[in-house]
Amino acid sequence: GPWIDMKTERYDFRSELNEPFAGFKKLRAQASYTDYQHDEIEGSEAMTTFKSKGYEGRIELVHNPLAKWEGVWGIQASQQKLDVTGEEATLAPNETQKYSLFGIEHRQFGDFHVELGTRLDHQKVDVDSEQKDFDGNAFSYSGAVNWDFKPNYKLSLVGSHQERLPLSQEL
């Protein structure tokens, strides 16, 4: 029967600085590189080959309390190239670039704890075929109020709006 021969290389970098500059508690940075390939083999022949190379980076800034609000804000960027070849290939080669801004804040008001979050994503997918390229945005946000009305008891109200951008395979 068919089987898969897979190879993956991944490199990660993570760093954190305490009190990097005035007004901020922490600066966190992450970066990664992934090189992935798998062959779908039937008998002794590779029928389809998937190759994917990608980079991702993220920077977060944790700020000191500001009007009693505490939180983190950040940016994230990624790039991925996907190439599928062979007799049974169903995906066109493509490149995806994605950029994001995000933030999470929280504050205590007596017995109430308020949490707010937001994220804005921009994504562009260039497809090497007659398929139309994709260029779009997604905006998500959430809010929560937690009421500690009695020791060991909490009542929460949570609301959110989530948007998701398509993966290149979904186009």
Regions found by a protein language model. Give the residues of each.
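A flexible loop/linker signature enriched in serine peptidases of the S9 family
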Residues: 162-164
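Face-selective signature of the C-terminal outer-membrane beta-barrel domain
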Residues: 5-148, 153-154, 158-160
